[in-house]
Design a protein with these regions (language model features):
Chain A
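C-terminal helix/juxtamembrane-tail motif
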Residues: 3-4, 154-175
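Residue-level signature of transmembrane alpha-helix interfaces in integral membrane proteins
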Residues: 87, 134, 139, 170-171
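GST-like domain detector, emphasizing the conserved glutathione-binding G-site
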Residues: 1-109, 113, 127-131, 175
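Short acidic/histidine-centered micro-motifs embedded in hydrophobic/aromatic stretches
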Residues: 51, 75-78, 122, 162-166
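Short, mixed-charge aromatic SLiMs
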Residues: 69-81, 143-157
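GST superfamily/GST-like fold recognition
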Residues: 109-132, 136-150, 160
Length: 175, 939
């Protein structure tokens, strides 16, 4: 199964949706497609994810105020445009640097509330974070703190490997 | 607040919106919400339009900053526009900003709107930024701008027309409309980039463009300069990378199909078709000679653009016409359509005369020599012409003169005195291709005498600025001579009527439509059809005895005369528009002659000619990201491909795999190796070979009994779906896309074998052994089906598989639309052996060096310098001379080094040729006569 479809299945379980949906993948980038019962199909990871959240009656995960809603969608867009597809080393480093700086004063991506943005960025970043060295994890300290927090959030990690972050700093001089 | 509104007498329905807007108003005043913009950023348009739509425009604090300003502290790269909220949060995504304005009004987004916004960010933006960059920064026009975004535009158009709603997400306007409109406006405001056939897109775009918030946004962002207002901003941005061409499953039209989950009926139908077996196959057409149209049948006449005789064709020429047409001809025969495929060499013209002088032969001898070269190349590539003729025949003269007389007697020709360029030094009238100068339309410096390579417009040589004789670089003088003109303006109305009837529902490629439309939009002009030459079709008119027809009047008539040389009943094909479907294949530069000039001649001649029904034009194939160039020894030419040791089927496969179907593509050696090793060797070859090997090894070469499980039935249904799509695509001549279906089926097959592991089961219980038999039987049947589907693409490999599997000839000759069991239990197959060979890195690197790919950048650079130096005004420019002197020195040391290394002779010769060319240019730039090479050496 394509990676995106797998991720959506994880999300379904996390949301407590019982009936597993069937996904197909479209094109070279394997964009997920959901065939809904009562309407046309839905295409795109962020679109389907938001749809599932509504289906599970957990709208608060999409944000509560206008501002929070816009911020959640902004990070979902960031996920599908910046995190997916761009896999050269420099791009990834830039992305982690930006996120690290952003998360400096935040618990979650919207600030103080856990949302779909945290879920999809966690899934999207997992493959990069597992490959980081301890030194890099300390360099992107705020990302590491956020990631470690999210992976311990009940039900989110499932079969994905748990990434180890060491509490005592190993590399004191890195910034 | 609501009460206040109602008291002021507004309509009830508007109450809520107003109240929300009032809230918004308060928000904006209370907080320090600030929008940061920079001049000319494309994102300004949707953001301001959305603000206007949500009634926030007047209240928004806007700061204009420089494009380099990092407004968002945590983003390394500057991003604008940005909205800073009073909470300190930043919205740096254009659609998130728009969304926020809408949310403040209480307007939420549904799934469909979200889907469009996600599509805009992931699919539209990457291609749109390329198109805008090409248009605004690089000053390109036409296809260069349109082709990157065409698929995306078609996707929007189809979605709108399929749902028949006026807006993207339904009956009323949504955020998606504003965001997409804002993104597309700079491009689509120029009608040239909003093709007429996208009617739904057009009407959607116009509906939005007239709305007040949109108009206001346009005014303040584009400032009446159109897309050029974005120039300063876009110039500072990195050049966007063209996203990879996507396979067909990503095509908008196939949305439903790729999302397809199999229904019970589809599975049942696939099983029924399978069980019907060979009985269901269509009867095979008996072979005929000559092939003639038959009433009541589908009669398909296929032509490929006539290659010019004295150029050895390169790979780009081959994929552009003869190979593409060959695939379609082979497919058409597999469908049992009554098919005739013709081509031939185009032999008349100045270039032939000159070549003859050079080689000390007569023009006819030159044509004979090169006609044979062409014939051999196409034979090696396995092109299945029914007839490959030539234009220097009595039939050509007869038919051309007949059309001419008919046009003359109907008043579509007139005489006029023409001012012509004559080179006094060479003492001859200069044919168009021997004049070069500055294009009068776009200012391109190396425009040819008949057409500008940059803007594509046709030029009368005399209109060129700063004309030069290409042979001696002398400035030619203007002399007058009498000529005949085809009165195209008189025929314009008939042409438009015919196009109106023909284009609707036909399979003309979008670029062919675009080019034709742009010709008509500019208005047709009379065209001179005679030339002061000897080597051509004589003009049968008093006072024109020493003139011949110009090739672009009579070359397209070559198709008719070649048919006449094939059969004396040629008129059954060419004067039979009711029964014949004419497919013409060519590269895009040939479109006007086939869509405008020849149809006008034929319509004017009033002799019921068969006119093109489907005009299939390709874009260009580049060589390793540059151009093929015979003079620079760069690229692979038809006669060289044979000496690479790579079989012709592999060349065919790769050229078809990268066929420049909707945009230019590149030939790359590394890619050729990768595609051979991954798609052919590991995917297709591996599957077919394994399927056959299992039959031989485990079942003594005899196809085993099969009992289909539900899994097998689903597989059959999947294969059937791919087969159907293959047919749909090839019927529309989407050759490259259909090839993907073949590869998908073998991927299904590999997976099927991998999951079912027949090599393990054969050692198991009775039931296991039976299962191994079923899996092997189904797999070998898929291999048989694939061999037929591959036939248009790789005819030799196809025959090899069919021999290995001992597929009966009647089965090989027809491709069904369903997947019947082609090899029933008990069928004995032959000896199975591997189909493809691995290409190794060393081998490919060697070829790359041999064909000049490595030196490409160097020579392009030199070319740029040289061409500047060629302009007469700069003859004495010391800087140019210095550049050339440096280039000569540099090239000289390249040659010395190669000689010192005792490098390959051909390689040394190529470098020496370059050196000599450079020296010539230097001499020209210095205004010296050419020294003999030896004298130069001593200097």
């Amino acid at each position: 199964m394509a990676a995106a479809a797998e991720e959506l299945t994880l999300l379904e379980k996390l949301l407590g949706l019982r009936r597993g949906n069937k996904y197909s993948a479209q094109g070279e980038r394997q964009i997920p497609v959901l065939q809904t019962n009562n309407g046309p199909s839905l295409t795109g990871l962020a679109t389907i994810a938001a749809h599932l959240v509504k289906q599970a009656n957990k709208e608060h995960l999409l944000g509560s105020t206008a501002e929070e809603k816009a911020v959640v969608q902004q990070w979902l867009e960031y996920r599908v445009t910046r995190i997916d597809g761009h896999s050269n080393k420099d791009e990834i480093r830039n992305m982690l640097k930006d996120l690290n700086s952003y998360l400096e004063d935040k618990v979650y991506l919207t600030g103080n509330n856990f949302t779909l943005a945290d879920i999809l960025l966690y899934y999207g970043l997992h493959r990069f974070i597992v490959d980081l060295t301890f030194q890099e994890k300390e360099k992107y300290l705020n990302v590491s703190r956020w990631f470690s927090h999210i992976q311990h959030y009940p039900g989110i990690r499932q079969h994905l490997s748990s990434v180890v972050f060491i509490k005592n700093r190993l590399y004191t001089n890195t910034h | 607040m609501q009460r206040g509104d109602r008291l002021s007498g507004s309509a009830e329905a508007e109450g809520e919106g107003r109240a929300n807007r009032f809230l918004l108003h308060q928000r904006l005043r209370g907080g320090g919400m600030r929008l940061f913009v920079t001049e000319g950023a494309p994102g300004n348009l949707p953001v301001l339009a959305a603000a206007g739509r949500a009634g926030a425009r007047g209240e928004l604090l806007i700061s204009t900053v420089s494009p380099e300003e990092r407004v968002v502290p945590f983003l390394t790269r500057p991003k604008l526009p940005v909205l800073k909220l009073d909470s300190g949060h930043y919205l740096f995504s254009t659609s998130a900003i728009c969304r926020y304005f809408f949310l403040l009004c209480g307007w939420e987004q549904d799934d469909l709107t979200n889907q469009w916004l996600e599509w805009e960010a992931t699919e539209l933006q990457p291609v749109l930024s390329v198109a805008l960059y090409n248009l605004v920064v690089q000053g390109k026009k036409g296809e260069d701008v349109l082709s990157p975004v065409r698929r995306a535009l078609i996707h929007i158009d189809h979605s709108l027309s399929r749902r028949s709603c006026p807006f993207l997400a339904g009956d009323s306007e949504s955020l998606a409309d504003i965001v997409l409109w804002g993104a597309l406006y700079p491009l689509l405001q120029d009608p040239a980039y909003l093709p007429d056939e996208l009617a739904a897109l057009q009407s959607w775009f116009q509906t939005l463009s007239v709305q007040e918030p949109c108009q206001q946004a346009v005014e303040s962002v584009l400032k009446k300069q159109g897309a050029l207002a974005l120039r300063t901003y876009l110039q500072k941005q990195p050049q966007p990378i063209v996203p990879l061409e996507r396979p067909v499953s990503n095509e908008p039209e196939e949305d439903e199909l790729s999302a397809h989950t199999l229904s019970e009926e589809e599975i049942a139908m696939a099983v029924t078709a399978w069980e019907e077996g060979l009985e269901a196959l269509p009867p095979v057409r008996p072979w005929q000679n000559p092939v003639l149209p038959v009433a009541g049948e589908r009669n398909v006449l296929i032509t490929s653009a006539l290659p010019y005789v004295n150029n050895v064709p390169h790979l780009g020429n081959i994929i552009g016409c003869v190979l593409s047409a060959d695939v379609f001809a082979r497919y058409s025969r597999l469908r049992q359509w009554n098919t005739l495929y013709l081509c031939g060499t185009d032999e008349y013209g100045t270039a032939t005369e000159t070549k003859a002088m050079e080689e000390g032969l007569t023009p006819q001898q030159i044509c004979d020599k090169y006609h044979a070269i062409h014939t051999n190349i196409y034979r090696w590539f396995n092109i299945s012409f029914d007839f490959f003729g030539r234009t220097t025949t009595p039939h050509q003269t007869k038919i051309t003169q007949d059309i001419f007389q008919r046009l003359l007697s109907r008043g579509f020709l007139f005489k006029d005195t023409v001012e012509q360029l004559r080179c006094e030094r060479c003492s001859r009238f200069l044919a168009d291709r021997f004049v070069e100068g500055v294009c009068p339309f776009c200012g391109y410096e190396e425009a040819r005498g008949d057409q500008c390579d940059k803007c594509g417009k046709l030029i009368n040589a005399i209109e060129l600025k700063k004309p030069q004789c290409k042979i001696c670089r002398e400035s030619p003088v203007v002399k007058s001579s009498q000529h005949l003109f085809l009165d195209l303006p008189k025929l314009e109305k008939r042409l438009e009527e015919w196009l109106g009837r023909t284009l609707a529902g036909s399979d003309w490629t979008p670029n062919a439509r675009f080019i034709t439309r742009s010709w008509l939009r500019d208005g047709l002009k009379p065209r001179c059809i005679t030339r002061d030459l000897k080597w051509g079709t004589p003009v049968p008119l008093e006072g024109f005895q020493d003139k011949v027809f110009y090739v672009w009047f009579d070359a397209t008539i070559g198709y008719l005369s070649i048919t006449a040389n094939y059969t004396d009943q040629w008129e059954k094909w060419w004067k039979n528009p009711e029964q014949v479907e004419l497919y013409q294949f060519m590269a895009k530069d040939n479109v006007p002659f086939h869509s405008v000039v020849f149809p006008c001649s034929a319509l004017g001649a009033e002799d019921n000619y068969t006119l093109v029904s489907h005009l299939i034009a390709t874009e260009y194939l580049n060589y390793e990201d540059g151009k093929f160039s015979k003079s620079r020894g760069v690229g692979v030419f038809g006669d060289m491909a044979q000496n690479t040791g790579i079989p012709s089927d592999i060349w065919r496969f790769y050229l078809l795999f990268v066929r420049p179907e909707s945009q230019d593509s590149s030939f790359s050696w590394t890619d050729l190796m990768l595609k051979n090793n991954s798609e052919l060797l590991n995917n297709l070859g591996n599957f077919v070979n394994r399927a056959g090997m299992f039959v031989c090894k485990f079942f003594g070469g005899c196809v085993p009994k099969m009992t289909l499980t539900p899994d097998d039935q689903r597989l059959l249904a999947h294969v059937t779906l791919e087969l159907r799509q293959y047919h749909q695509l090839l019927e529309k001549v989407r050759i490259r896309d259909a090839l993907r279906c073949v590869l998908t089926i073998s991927r299904h097959g590999n997976q099927y074998i991998q999951v079912n592991e027949p090599w393990k089961r054969i050692k198991g219980s009775e039931a296991d052994r039976h299962r191994a038999g079923t899996v092997t039987g189904v797999a070998v049947n898929m291999a048989a089906l694939l061999s037929i589907m591959m036939q248009p693409y790789m005819p030799t490999v196809s025959t090899t598989i069919q021999t290995q599997l001992q597929l009966p000839p009647a089965v090989c000759a027809a491709l069904p639309t369903n997947f019947p069991c082609l090899l029933p239990a008990g069928h004995q197959i032959g000896i199975v052996s591997p189909l493809f060979q691995k290409l190794e890195n060393d081998q490919i690197e060697g070829l790359r060096k041999r064909f000049g790919g490595g030196q490409l950048e160097d020579s392009l650079e030199l070319k740029a310098k040289v061409s500047k130096a060629e302009a007469p005004a700069e003859l004495a420019d010391p800087e140019q001379i210095k550049l050339l002197t440096d280039a000569v020195t540099k090239q000289g040391s390249v040659v010395r080094e190669l000689k010192a290394q005792k490098a390959d002779k051909a390689q040394v010769a190529a470098e020496v040729a370059k050196l000599l060319e450079l020296k010539q240019h230097l001499a020209l730039a210095e205004g010296k006569p050419l020294d003999p090479p030896k004298g130069k050496k001593k200097k």
